[in-house]
Amino acid sequence: MMSKVFAYLDHIFRMVRPRRLLYMAIDGVAPRAKMNQQRSRRFRSALEAEKLRAEAAAKGEPEAAGDPFDSNCITPGTPFMARLSEHLKFYVLKKQTEDPLWQKATVILSGHEVRGEGEHKIMEHIRWARGEPGWDPNQTHCLYGLDADLIMLALVTHEPHFCLLREVVKFGAGANSGQPSRETLQNPTDDGFLLLHVGLLREYLDAEFRGIADALPFPYDCERVVDDFVLLCMLVGNDFLPPLPTLDIAEGALNTLFSTYRELLPTLGGYVSGDDGGGTFDAKRLEVILERMGEMEAKVLADRSRDAAANEERQARRASGGRGFGGRGAKNGEKGAAGSGAGSRVSEADARFKKAMAALANGAGADDAVAAAAAPDAPLEPEKETSSGISADPTMMSAAKREMFEEGGGGIEGWKEMYYREKLGLKIGEAPPLRELRQAYFEGLSWVLQYYYRGVASWTWYYPFHYAPMASDLADGLGSLTAKFDYGVPFRPFEQLLAVQPPQSSALLPEPFRWLMTAPHSPLAAFFPDELKVDFEGKRNDWEGVVLLPFLDEHLLKQCIASVPASKLTDAQTARNKPGPLVVFRHAPDGVGDVASTLPRAFPGLHPCRSEALESMPPGEFPKDRKCFGG
């Protein structure tokens, strides 16, 4: 496996040929706000793996020899990640010793032991480097990765020369489930990759909005428009907040948002993003836009009601005609066809594009998004209990909610009352709980925007609800809200492992901690339920389902971790639980001594090694009075 990793890195390096710096960033411990999503994905992944094993056993297929590879091991603090870091260090030493191309650039390795998500560690480096003497504002940046948020991260830098590199992903049946083709991974060629020039996207945004320049009572500024664009995109979904209930890309929500923005901007008195260019926003101006979106909620929901009823009728006709759907079935709890009436009339390619964009906006990985776009539609009503142990409510819009939009129904107010009661346990007349929901979502928008522009605002903050408020309720008094964050400290690796892993992956933790995930009498037992409930109502794809896991009690979790004596851990385990440094590599023509190979069967040692590795601790909180990104 490591040899293949090395070969793939070789190919990417030779395509891009960095002349100044190569920054290799691996995910370290994430902010608490991200752990909710990580926890949901890992729990679902574990249940799906169990389901596949059960299906294979039912078919009489032999079990694979040895323990199956648990992809959840790709989490900070595991033995796998520790080995990966050591192998990558040797790999860089080897390349700078032997390969002239690698000798020209400085290499920084930020491994799993360095806190922060990989792409945000790269942004952190750029943010700090911009303030250093000798920074070249015309240098070119190339960011490689598959994550959905890289475009937004590239935009917020306001760097003029920024491009994104990723593999070509195939659409359609038999296309490796949205993954890069096997040929690309096994025998990579330049034709297997795509390069997005973010500067070109900036030009398109400028062309889109420059037409309103004459109508503005303040100077038109493309950089501020870019910041506003990023903020508006946050409203339809990100890795840290659920999307607003009536904003769905597949229904044209982004187009509606941008049209509303174009119409209202001349009346707002300025841009929605903050004047400091530091990831803030003017809540009163955003309130005006959300009020307009709130006025459209009744129509959006009424359209959904009609589409759901029509789709249910089509399903019934097909069933009575003896024809079923191919692909993913109802028993898998997966959501099928749908969207607005207009969506059913667009071409297949447009429909796939909308599905993929919806996936990206709602926080799915890029590969998940493409898989969703390629997948066939599934039946409307899944079973209440699936074979994988995942419970599913009716998809699309339930019959009870559809009745709200029939003649004599409760309309939007009735729908809201049912939504808040069923999804959030709130009564619409209870002002304090609704204020708490609004405040939490406002804090979430503030946290996410600061995260993109300035880095982590708080390591411990998270959104404590599974659902978002309605746009009209979020807008109510938004302009008077404020957000203040406590920076806090990152989780330690074993704390994050315990926070995000399902019981099926308990072996990834040192033995003294495993009972906390598996024992019925564990103080944390309530946070590791036997049955995983997923709400698919209103969702078109399985990955969109809302995983209804209880939110972990951080203080209780840390108490449980602290209750295990350090003497019960080996030296290697203790080392894996500590934060570590960045490693900076530079070519050393005169040599620095011999280095043993970490993979002696595949690669010889370096005699001598001609690369110098120096350790450096990552920077702390970015100064609040220092200019970061922004127009």
What are the roles of these predicted feature ranges?
Residues 1-631:
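Noncatalytic, typically N-terminal accessory segments of nucleic acid-processing enzymes
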